[in-house]
Amino acid sequence: MLERIGISLEDGLLEQFDKLIAEKGYVNRSEAIRDLIRDALVQRAFTESSGREERVAVVTLVYDHDSSSLAQKLAHIQHENHRAVVSALHVHMDPHNCLEVLVLRGRGKDVVAMGESLVATKGVKYGKLVPATAGHDLG
């Protein structure tokens, strides 16, 4: 069942939102707002969980592979937590930069700790931990 609701937004914010949803290919505002709500609920489930529930997340890292100590540090963190690493993808972006995408699975607090450790490693140019969900509780 769907419920209709109303929201109030400043003109400038609505204009930016409409531009964003058009760029992303949403057919209407409702779909975009539902996705924003789902994302917020997934984030909350990850941060508010007791840490015992099994969670899945994706970690994205970009770094300069010429920094051998950095590559070794990242590999060391992964090997220390090898049971949590479900999959790893390594892409050579250009002659110097590498993209690494890791799928992690385990207790929520362990997944978050490992992901944050990788992202915070000195020398990582870009890093992001993205929680994933099967969506059972999202309606």
From Swiss-Prot:
MF annotations from Gene Ontology:
DNA binding; DNA-binding transcription factor activity; nickel cation binding
Q: Which organism is it from?
A: Anaeromyxobacter sp. (strain K)
Per the UniProt entry, the signal peptide is none
Record family assignment? Belongs to the transcriptional regulatory CopG/NikR family.
| GO BP annotations listed | response to nickel cation
Cofactor(s) of this protein: Ni(2+)
Q: Know the name of this protein?
A: Putative nickel-responsive regulator
Transmembrane intervals? none
Alphabetical UniProt keywords: DNA-binding, Metal-binding, Nickel, Transcription, Transcription regulation
Q: Binding residues for Ni(2+), per the UniProt record?
A: H79, H90, H92, C98
Organism ancestry: Bacteria, Pseudomonadati, Myxococcota, Myxococcia, Myxococcales
- Give the cofactor note text: Binds 1 nickel ion per subunit.
Pfam families listed in its UniProt record:
NikR_C, RHH_1
